[in-house]
């Protein structure tokens, strides 16, 4: 009876987590996170892709927004007044505008709405349409010598049937129809408007109500009633 020669078992090589993490960066960031967890590399990938929603979803059960310093460090705003409130604001999603108005101190709101650092403004504008539009309108008002320094903002959005769309606070909602938010705002007298807008937006900067008319893919008209 012939003897069978057994081959020696190959030794299993366990790669360090850092090397695995480096290899996995070529995968989808969500899959990357599910394999190795929310590592620093994964966090940076998600934030580079402006994917805050999945960043928050992938955090462990023990996670609390008020203790997360990573996003502020990533943006370089750790010394800014908004820093302690940024991640809680992001975690509120559709209710972010309400949280901003009611839970953030007035002096912080004023700075964030009127004189934000460019990095912070760019980041918040990508997360929240209400913030993007508020900043665009505030800058327009100043260019037109209408001084505004609001501490609160509320936005009511209507379609051509005057139906209120209450999902405006979420960046992803309605974004396909609001491409024109990237164009400039121009003044227009209400008497010069010859047709109904495709979209009407009432912006409350404190108690000051400003109406905007949108005609898709063209421009935003700031209605002047003088």
From Swiss-Prot:
Chain ranges of the F-box domain: 9-58
Organism superkingdom: Viruses
Keywords noted in UniProt: Host nucleus, Transcription, Transcription regulation, Ubl conjugation pathway
Pathway the protein contributes to: Protein degradation; proteasomal ubiquitin-dependent pathway
Signal peptide: none
GO biological process, one term: proteasome-mediated ubiquitin-dependent protein catabolic process
Keyword Cell inner membrane set for record: no
GO cellular component terms listed in the entry, alphabetical order: host cell nucleus
Main location: host cell
Compartments, as annotated in UniProt: Host nucleus
Keyword Transcription among UniProt keywords: yes
Subunit composition and interactions: Interacts with host S-phase kinase-associated protein 1/SKP1.
Function: F-box protein that manipulates the host DNA damage response (DRR) in order to promote viral multiplication. Acts as a substrate recognition component of SKP1/Cullin/F-box (SCF) complexes for targeted protein polyubiquitination.
Protein name: Late expression factor 7
């Amino acid at each position: 009876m012939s003897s069978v020669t057994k081959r020696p078992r190959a030794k299993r090589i366990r790669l360090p987590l850092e090397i695995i993490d480096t290899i996995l960066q070529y995968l989808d960031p969500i899959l990357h996170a599910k394999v190795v967890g929310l590592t620093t590399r994964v966090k940076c990938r998600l934030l580079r892709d402006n994917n805050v929603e999945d960043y928050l979803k992938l955090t462990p059960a023990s996670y609390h927004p008020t203790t997360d310093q990573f996003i502020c460090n990533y943006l370089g705003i750790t010394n800014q007044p908004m820093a302690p409130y940024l991640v809680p604001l992001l975690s509120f999603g559709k209710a972010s505008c309400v949280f901003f108005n009611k839970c953030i101190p007035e002096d912080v709101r004023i700075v964030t709405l009127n004189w934000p650092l460019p990095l912070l403004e760019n980041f918040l504008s990508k997360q929240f349409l209400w913030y993007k539009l508020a900043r665009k309108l505030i800058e327009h008002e100043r260019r037109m010598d209408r001084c505004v320094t609001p501490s609160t903002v509320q936005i009511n959005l209507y379609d051509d049937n005057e139906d209120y769309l209450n999902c405006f606070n979420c960046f992803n909602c309605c974004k396909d129809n609001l491409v024109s938010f990237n164009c400039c705002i121009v003044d227009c007298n209400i008497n010069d408007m010859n047709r109904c807008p495709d979209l009407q937006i009432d912006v409350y900067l404190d108690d000051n109500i400003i109406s905007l008319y949108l005609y898709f893919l063209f421009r935003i008209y700031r209605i002047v009633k003088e």
